[in-house]
């Protein structure tokens, strides 16, 4: 038989193999912005491997256009919010968060909680729009999906998985205070050495820092139980027709894929159904556009600085823009600044403004000396991967924590956006560029990031395919999910043992008293005789 016919027969056999069930059907509960960027990377790889991916998105979704061609199937459900209204809400809340005064703990975190509640109200509205859409639910039911994939910071996917009786995989960066991870996933975060996310603490805490960390833990737990849990518990109970809780339904997730890594996160215990996939977007740099490459090359030995505060920040105040531009004009490096606004008056000849930059490709360029970042996790992972020291100017959410982690690792200098001066920014840049320790530290993190037996993306895809092949991963799910809080902490056992000890002590005391009574009675009787 010729090689040609052998190849054709082999291809036919492979096609039969793939069509006979090796490829699965994935239902995705969509998220927005950076949450979607990471999810999309996983989904595109699943499609490359022959899986069918259906993304469930609202008609208000900012990132989805059903008219655009894509390998992903987009199932749009109607909602009363418009795209413009939804985008305005998000931008307003993020602006509010980034401008919150940090003078007092209670004021700062109470307002953060209000912001999270606002997003929670939108999430529950979208979820109601889906489950009340009988036509859509019937269509999804008949599609016979093999797994649901979602970011739990936007709840609802677990309800769909429960209704359709299919496995659930989460992909998550974090939730405020780790409340979902702890109360729903059973994660272990001992407050004695694991700082709460958004606390900006390290794992080397003083006594007062541990007190502060414990206050954070209690605060987030209280707010979660007070509001988030109750509204979702009630809604899920109504839909399922039985009493249930968000913790119970979320706790049924088969696998939790956490977008973190040990060169970024502080060490803490992990459960068997949890894996780290931090650095999904990290990849070798591609060639730059011609004009940009020429500008980078013109920097000579001084190199370039890459500057971006992310896609969420627009219309920077003129005063802040001029402070930054003035600082950048003081350094010998050329600067590529992602900036969407009016050109600052103090902009130097060494700085070019771009509405968009190929961030990963610039960070991977050999002439890049430093990265000025808002502290988004994706950007930090790319900087780590390419070994670029950072100047962090965090704005909101986990960004202060991320920069604090890099500062602890000796890979970044942190500044405050609202109070920094031109001199502060210029000195910070000179420090990370000229002090070799920053480069050495970030290169160490880079070597750790690259030295993995399996790439984060391949691990993520493996676990999703694993769940599809085995119809779940319940063998990895800890029995802790089936225990009440007092059983989990063995309070019933401790109470029983204390009762036993108390009973034994009581019996011994009674025996001693009886013997003493007998002895004294016998003594009195002897005297009377």
From Swiss-Prot:
Signal sequence segment: 1-24
Molecular function terms from GO: glucuronosyltransferase activity
Residues passing through the membrane, by range: 494-514
Annotated glycan sites: 67-68
Reaction it catalyzes: glucuronate acceptor + UDP-alpha-D-glucuronate = acceptor beta-D-glucuronoside + UDP + H(+)
Subcellular localization: Microsome membrane; Endoplasmic reticulum membrane
Keywords for the protein's UniProt record, in alphabetical order: Endoplasmic reticulum, Glycoprotein, Glycosyltransferase, Membrane, Microsome, Signal, Transferase, Transmembrane, Transmembrane helix
Disulfide feature: none
Protein name: UDP-glucuronosyltransferase 2B33
Gene that encodes the chain: UGT2B33
């Amino acid at each position: 038989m010729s090689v040609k016919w052998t190849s054709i027969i082999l291809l036919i056999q492979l096609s039969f193999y793939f069509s006979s069930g090796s490829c699965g059907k994935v239902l995705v509960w969509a998220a927005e912005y950076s949450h979607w960027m990471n999810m999309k990377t996983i989904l595109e790889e699943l499609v490359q491997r022959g899986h069918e991916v259906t993304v469930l998105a609202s008609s208000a979704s900012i990132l989805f256009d059903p008219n655009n061609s894509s390998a992903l199937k987009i199932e749009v459900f109607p909602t009363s919010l418009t795209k413009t209204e939804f985008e305005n809400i998000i931008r307003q809340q993020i602006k509010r968060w980034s401008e919150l005064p940090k003078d007092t703990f209670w004021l700062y975190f109470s307002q953060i909680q209000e912001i999270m509640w606002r997003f929670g109200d939108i999430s529950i509205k979208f979820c109601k729009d889906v489950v009340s859409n009988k036509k859509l639910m019937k269509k999804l039911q008949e599609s016979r999906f093999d797994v649901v994939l979602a970011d739990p910071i936007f709840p609802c996917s677990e309800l769909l998985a429960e209704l359709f009786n299919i496995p659930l995989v989460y992909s998550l960066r974090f939730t405020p205070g780790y409340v979902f991870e702890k109360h729903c996933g059973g994660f272990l975060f001992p407050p004695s050495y694991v700082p709460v996310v958004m606390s900006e603490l390290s794992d080397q805490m003083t006594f007062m820092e541990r007190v502060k960390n414990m206050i954070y833990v209690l605060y987030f737990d209280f707010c979660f139980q007070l509001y988030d849990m109750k509204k979702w518990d009630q809604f899920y109970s109504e839909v399922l027709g039985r009493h249930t809780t968000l913790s119970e339904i979320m706790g049924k997730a088969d696998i939790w894929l956490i977008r973190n890594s040990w060169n970024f996160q502080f060490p803490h215990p992990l459960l068997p159904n949890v894996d780290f996939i931090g650095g999904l977007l990290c990849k070798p740099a591609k060639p730059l556009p011609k004009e940009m490459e020429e500008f980078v090359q013109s920097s000579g030995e001084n190199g370039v600085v890459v500057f971006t505060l992310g896609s969420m920040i627009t219309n920077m105040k003129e005063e802040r823009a001029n402070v930054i531009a003035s600082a950048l004009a003081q350094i010998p490096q050329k600067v590529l600044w992602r900036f969407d606004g009016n050109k600052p008056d103090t902009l130097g000849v060494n700085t070019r403004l771009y509405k968009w930059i190929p961030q990963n490709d610039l960070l991977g360029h050999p002439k890049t000396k430093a990265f000025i970042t808002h502290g988004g996790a994706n950007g930090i992972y790319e900087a780590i991967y390419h070994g670029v020291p950072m100047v962090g100017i965090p704005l909101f959410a986990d960004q202060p924590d991320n920069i604090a982690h890099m500062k602890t690792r000796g890979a970044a200098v942190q500044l405050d956006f609202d109070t920094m001066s031109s001199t502060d920014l210029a000195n910070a840049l000179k420090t990370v560029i000229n002090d070799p320790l920053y480069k050495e530290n970030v290169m160490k993190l880079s070597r750790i990031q690259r030295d993995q037996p399996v790439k984060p993306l391949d691990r993520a895809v493996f676990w999703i395919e694993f769940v599809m092949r085995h119809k779940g991963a319940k063998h990895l799910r800890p029995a802790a999910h089936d225990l009440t809080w007092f059983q989990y902490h063995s309070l019933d056992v401790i109470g029983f043992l204390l009762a036993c000890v108390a009973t034994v002590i009581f019996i011994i005391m009674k025996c001693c008293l009886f013997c003493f009574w007998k002895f004294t009675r016998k003594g009195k009787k002897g005297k009377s005789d």
